[in-house]
Regions:
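Catalytic nucleophile-elbow at a beta strand-turn-alpha helix junction centered on a G-D-S/GDSL motif
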Residues: 32-47, 78, 107
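Alpha-helical cap/lid subdomain in secreted, periplasmic
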Residues: 28-30, 50, 54-66, 80-285
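A structural signal for the hydrophobic beta-strands that form the central parallel beta-sheet
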Residues: 36-37, 71, 156, 215
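Bacterial N-terminal signal peptides that target proteins for export
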Residues: 1-10
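Short beta->alpha junction loops
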Residues: 71-78
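Boundary at the C-terminal end of the N-terminal hydrophobic targeting segment
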Residues: 22-24
């Protein structure tokens, strides 16, 4: 298997590592299982009708490949928790493939996060339980090693963004985590979907500082963010431009359903808030 780098941002030296077998072809075969290991971004990627997991599966099907998803995203999870449940949630399901989306919470959770390495763990930034969480480098390497030992082919996803202000402190902190993922993917010779580079490129191109371009809250995906994630994963799985166009042509019904679901959720949230406020007001009047 040889790998081709698709350059996204020359000034970032960012790339997608795409599997290629001499003749370009989609790596996933009909009937294969794909596990999607991750946090709330991945949980939403399956839970939402327009989530990236569903778009990936629909995109493959549009190209004649019926793949079976194994959803394995849990809200709030970090690298140590994903490692702890790897066998139960992924390996026991015997998938042929596994995408790994991990890193946002390791950084975003601050003192409760997971340090990149042993040196970072000793900076005094973390709480007194940090030693029980290990380090990001060790946890991610163990996940990849265990998956490969079980015959599962991993696809690495760089962590997206923490706030769409690319100069935020959190985005600065997550950069070395993503640099490690790129290097590990290269060393292990596994496909890399450099989603962080794709997100940075898109946010800069849009140039709308006060508008959420790809996320609903700076972290979790909106419809456009899910689409961009799906494109990155499908590219890493070997889809060419024509195949990606086929995939994207299958998405509008899912996008519409996702928008409707988001609207209903927002309405329900607003209604619940109004009812709570009214109840509190009634209580004060007694």
């Amino acid at each position: 298997m040889r790998y081709t780098h698709i350059r996204l941002l020359p000034f970032l030296a960012a790339a997608l590592l795409v599997p290629n077998l001499g003749k370009a072809e989609i790596a996933v075969k009909n009937g294969e299982k794909i596990a999607f290991l991750g946090d709330s971004i991945t949980a939403g990627g399956w839970g939402s009708p327009s989530g990236y997991v569903r778009l990936v599966i629909a995109g493959l099907e549009a190209n004649g490949i019926k793949a079976e998803p194994v959803p394995a995203g849990i809200s709030g999870h970090k690298s140590d928790q994903m490692l702890a449940r790897l066998d139960k949630d992924v390996l026991s399901k015997k998938p042929q493939w596994m995408t790994l989306s991990c890193g946002v919470n390791d950084v975003w959770h601050g003192p409760r996060g997971v340090p990149l390495d042993d040196a970072m763990a000793k900076t005094g930034t973390y709480d007194d339980k940090v030693s029980t969480r290990g380090t990001y480098k060790k946890n991610i390497t163990a996940i990849i090693d265990q998956a490969q030992a079980a015959g599962v082919k991993p696809v690495m996803l760089t962590a997206t963004v923490i706030q769409e202000n690319l100069d935020s402190k959190e985005n600065g902190l997550i950069a070395p985590y993503n640099a490690f993922l790129r290097e590990l993917a290269k060393d292990k010779k596994i496909p890399l979907a450099d989603l962080n580079a794709m997100f940075q490129e898109r946010i800069k191109a849009e140039n709308k500082p006060n508008v959420k371009v790809l996320t609903s809250d700076g972290v979790h995906m909106n419809v456009e963010g899910n689409k961009l994630m799906a494109i990155g994963v499908l590219q890493a799985l070997g889809l060419n431009t024509a195949e990606l166009d086929k995939a994207k042509a299958s998405w509008p019904p899912l996008e519409a359903a996702g928008i409707m679901a988001a609207q209903k959720a927002a309405e329900a949230k607003a209604k619940a808030a109004a009812e709570k406020k009214a109840k509190e007001a009634a209580g004060k009047g007694k």
